[in-house]
Amino acid sequence: MKKILLTLFVAFFAFLTYAAAAYQPHFSTAGFFEIAGTGRNAYSMNPAWRMYKGHVDGAENVSFDDSSWKLTSLPDGIEKLPMEASGCVNYQGEVWYRKHFNADAAWKGQRLVLYFEAIMGKSKVWVNGKLMKQHFGGFLPVIVDVSNILKYGEDNVITVMADNGDDPSYPPGKAQDVLDFTYAGGIYRDCWLIKTNKVFITDANEENHIAGGGVFVSYGKVSEELSEINIKTMLKNIAGSNFKGSLVYELQDANRTVVWSKNLKTSISRQKSTTLSTKAAIKDVQLWTPDHPYLYRLNIYVKNQQDKIVDGYYIRIGIRSLEFKAGDGFWLNGKPYPEPLIGANRHQDFAIVGNALSNSLHWRDAKKLKDTGLRVIRNAHYPQDPAFMDACDELGLFVIENTPGWQFWNPEPSFANYVYNDIRNIVRRDRNRPSVWLWEPILNETWYPDDFAKKVKGIVHEEYPYPYCYTACDATAKGSEYYNIQFTHPLSGDPTWALSSDKVDPKKNYFTREWGDNVDDWNSHNSPSRASRSWGEYPMLVQAKGYGKPDYQYTCYDALFRTTRQHVGGCLWHSFDHQRGYHPDPFYGGIMDNFRQPKYSYYMFMSQRPNQKNPSLIADSGPMVYIANAMTPFSPADVTIYSNCDSVTLTYNKGGKVYTYAKAKNRVGMPSPIITFKDVFHMMDDKELSRQKKQSDSYLLAQGYVDGKLVATHQVKPTRRPSRIKLWVDNEGTSLHADGSDMVTVVAAIADDQGNIKRLNNEHILFSIEGEGRIVGDQESFSNPVEVKWGTAPVLIQSTTTAGKIKVKASVVWQGKTTPVDGYIELESVKPEYPLIGNEREMNAIPQNGVRMCLQGNTNMQSSKEKLKEVEKQQADFE
């Protein structure tokens, strides 16, 4: 009966998780969103690749036997690594990939392009034995036209060699053992096959035209009453005859109502291209802001003389203007931005898989950060995955776009040329995104030549020669005089790093690119900001206080709200825990761990968001209250609470004392100070209630009020005897797609009968699975079984290429009569958004990693409990 009730509880919990959020994100492919019936199709090339780690001779040849190579799906990061994987434990060197697939005979005569979103390091791509592309750099697209090399109706082979080994000849250039992040490796982002007709809209990265290629959307005057949009599109005709037709635009609002359209006549000679420009004047405009990230849909069609669509797709645009006024800070859409912009840096590193995140994991990263009220992300230290950028566009996160680089310069001219090329391709890839706030073309913390900063700023403006384009540079770096936005600390923050008042330029504006980290020295890296979640309450409380308002002067949330308008905000270092090359310790300073499990500081950040619900946001918003005290025998007597409410009450135990806090109305500094109620919790009070059989009377209850109304509550209870494992899916309401690549985190927790999580527990959880999913990682990477840390044990689940149900079971590794009862949860994958291309036999043969489910588990708990009641009585009698 106990097991049945547990299963029903978990099933109900899972239902709530999936039902909570109706919104399902959609992701761009090669910079566009597909429209059916246009002749343009995107196919996922992610499934069924063969992979070999190391050098191998002859693997580019069609006849090479790869049957012994490991089967994998993209994104692939070469290997699965444990949560603690710093100090260069990851593989560096060559890795080879091969993919077999049948090219549909119906594709013959059309244009087909392989589009790799990124391949780490230096790479080569062969198709059917012919070298088609060499590429240097691990963060930008690799594009290969395969139209004339494919064998239609037959088997084809793509071979990729990727080498993530140390190489100073191209950026970042820094050897990994002296690098503050890791390169990871492999084909770690998506690969697409794009099919079009021979008259088509070009791709800006493929064409390599300054401020050209593809579609370029820019803006003139912007206001709610009337906004000017400039649209430029490059078309190409590779057919054997001339083309006459039209280029058609439709701008749709969020309700899919057409608010503007345009038909431009065009003629293109064979083997030629043309660029058409037009302007649109839009009335009654919904402007894009971080708190109102309104996206219009721009449909683009190419039609022939018979009015038949021969190419087309849509992109999402947000209409907004950016301005940094001399000494007066940031202005958005013609109005001064009302408060400092607070954000965080983001590496793409995730537990177990490294950089090889699925699109949904990228989206959930952005969603979790936006839930805290952050408004800007710095892409440290390279351009991020397009899926993450898609998320920033629709969730309302400004982005500082970084050039790949970190504390390294190579004086060889070729190195600088690679940097310049990266900058151009970053702008071309992301120039239409409303989320892009600043371009950071300089190399992070690097002593580059005197002319470099001026040169790269010029390149950005060559590629974006329109209004609302801004670049930023460190205030103390060479060439900073050319930049109107400079990175530094505020005078209210870290005095060591801040510009002295006599050096502050009244014509400039300032921003803190990295704040919060506080190491003793740059060798030991001991820091009160670096608190592993597994270390528990006190370190997490110290971290949160340091980020909010420490007892010493330092750049923190509070300090950034004590600046003039000239200092426009700052980004925390760092949002998530991540691996590093040059230090054996991971970076523990994230507000979440590398599985994106929150620390106390996450809720401190969340308490700074506005307390009014915002219906314009997909992300969470509105009032919140959180008790940062677990009521363990070791929990502090002082109770810390994070809340954005006007007032908060804290009730200690049923019928007990009620404590009250009211936020001062005319305060300065952070929007919501950390609340501390002194000398509240004592374990002996809980003991007394427990001995009276009044365990349910022992609790902390926080209630938040806005305008006198109760709007938020949070209750914490002491955890009793661990009796079961409970599970939940950490998916932010998104579906799991059966594309062989998508991943979702399932979290197991040791809990008591009431579902309270046993934070102080050292169990190991073994996950097993059945159905259309596989566990990512294994015992070798400490991914399964998983050690319980601060009460929880997470695991990554990956979909297969077949939609269906997935059942996950969690058990303690060593089971006995009184160990916690197994937990179960069921989820279901849905059909993929795009057709999958690959050898079907190999797609189905990808190993089902992890333990396949055995339904026999620990079912003895109920009978054991009856015996234990007698033991409990005997102990009480003899005490």
Where are these regions (language model features)?
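Substrate-binding clefts and catalytic carboxylate motifs of secreted carbohydrate-active enzymes
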Residues: N41-E60, E79, I119, L179, ...
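Short, hydrophobic beta-strand segments
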Residues: V146, T278-L287, I675-Q695, N784-T801
